[in-house]
Amino acid sequence: MKFEMHTKIISNEKEVRLHIEDNLFQLILDGYHLFTIQEILSLYKSNEERIGSAIVQKLEWENGKTTLNYQLVSLQSVN
């Protein structure tokens, strides 16, 4: 099973919103991934498109998958 370390979060639009008011999201990734916890990380929609910043709140490894819960702390928007 592969193991990867990351300094940014790339959602590929597969995130699920857990809590609206707290801007909490969950992302499930194949394989085992390691992220810094409770540090601000850049958040990307794809490899090229940065959409904001997030803080990892919880990280779980189970059955060859990584579950990442993060809080969106800033959003880059042109609206």
Regions of interest found by a model, annotated:
Residues M5-L24:
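Short, basic/aromatic beta-hairpin or loop at an interaction surface
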Residues L24-G31:
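Short alpha-helix capping/helix-loop boundary micro-motifs
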Residues L34-I37:
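Short, well-ordered loop/turn sites that connect or cap secondary structure elements
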Residues E49-E60:
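Short beta-strand-centered aromatic/proline hotspots
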Residues E62-V73:
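Short, solvent-exposed secondary-structure boundary/capping segments
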